[in-house]
């Protein structure tokens, strides 16, 4: 059974690329045609590439490694969070902070601060502080939660791959992955450079439904891989 159908991709608008004046010539082999000034992505290639990415992610997950889901643009934020949580993986959907992979010790300290503030809120410490102090600490906690909430339980050394929505926007995350030799799977639109990505999924990275569909398939691959890992252990 195929992982995804052309019909699903069409219905979600995965085939709509960017305007023809905003394109990267390196994406030419993934383009089917041009219509009304918009590039149309070749969905036969997208189906094949999703299948390749699915098998790769499944293998990484079956080895007990983690997939870090990244998508900070508005259209990706919800899908990234939902699908990472569904597959019990880590995610960044607000802002990539420099060093999230390459300087995780510093990031870990900030996660420690978030955990400390959560504990203070839970154990009643906030109740004995002044209203002004509580507002300040709550604001700090919210900011930390937005940026770090999805990687609280992450061990950077166990990240086996990145799944990225829009490699142009997430270039800092990709460059950190390159330094560490971590492979990148990404939804790559017609304005992106596919050479920056190990597993290219040609598709629309601006439509919420398109992003959700592809992200859900990556999460499915993680879940299937983890089930395989559990079966192997048994």
From Swiss-Prot:
Alphabetized GO MF terms: structural constituent of ribosome
Positions of disulphide bridges: none
GO cellular component terms attached to this protein's record: cytosolic small ribosomal subunit
Keywords (A to Z) from UniProt: Ribonucleoprotein, Ribosomal protein
GO BP term, pick one: translation
Keyword Repeat: no
Superkingdom: Bacteria
Keyword Ribosomal protein in annotation: yes
Cross-referenced NCBIfam families: rpsB_bact
Family from the record: Belongs to the universal ribosomal protein uS2 family.
Xref: PANTHER family: 30S RIBOSOMAL PROTEIN S2 PROKARYOTIC AND ORGANELLAR (PTHR12534), SMALL RIBOSOMAL SUBUNIT PROTEIN US2M (PTHR12534:SF0)
Name listed for the protein in its UniProt record: Small ribosomal subunit protein uS2
Organism per entry: Clostridium kluyveri (strain ATCC 8527 / DSM 555 / NBRC 12016 / NCIMB 10680 / K1)
């Amino acid at each position: 059974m195929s992982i995804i159908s052309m019909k699903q991709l069409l219905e979600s608008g995965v085939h709509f690329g960017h305007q023809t004046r905003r394109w990267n010539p390196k994406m030419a082999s993934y383009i089917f045609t041009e219509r009304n000034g918009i590039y149309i992505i070749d969905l036969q290639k997208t189906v094949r590439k999703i299948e390749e990415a699915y098998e790769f992610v499944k293998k990484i997950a079956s080895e007990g490694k983690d997939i870090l889901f990244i998508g900070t643009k508005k259209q990706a934020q919800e899908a990234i969070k939902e699908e990472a949580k569904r597959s019990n993986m880590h995610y960044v959907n607000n802002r990539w902070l420099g060093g999230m992979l390459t300087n995780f010790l510093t990031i870990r300290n900030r996660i420690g601060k978030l955990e400390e503030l959560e504990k203070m809120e839970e154990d009643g410490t906030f109740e004995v502080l002044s209203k002004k102090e509580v507002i300040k600490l709550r604001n700090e906690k919210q900011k930390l939660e937005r940026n770090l909430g999805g990687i609280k339980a992450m061990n950077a050394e166990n990240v086996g791959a990145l799944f990225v929505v829009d490699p142009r926007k997430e270039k800092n995350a990709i460059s950190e992955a390159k330094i560490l030799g971590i492979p990148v799977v990404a939804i790559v639109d017609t304005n992106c450079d596919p050479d920056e990505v190990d597993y290219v999924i040609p598709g629309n990275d601006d439509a919420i439904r398109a992003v959700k569909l592809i992200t859900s398939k990556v999460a499915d691959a993680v879940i299937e891989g983890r089930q395989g890992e559990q079966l192997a252990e048994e």
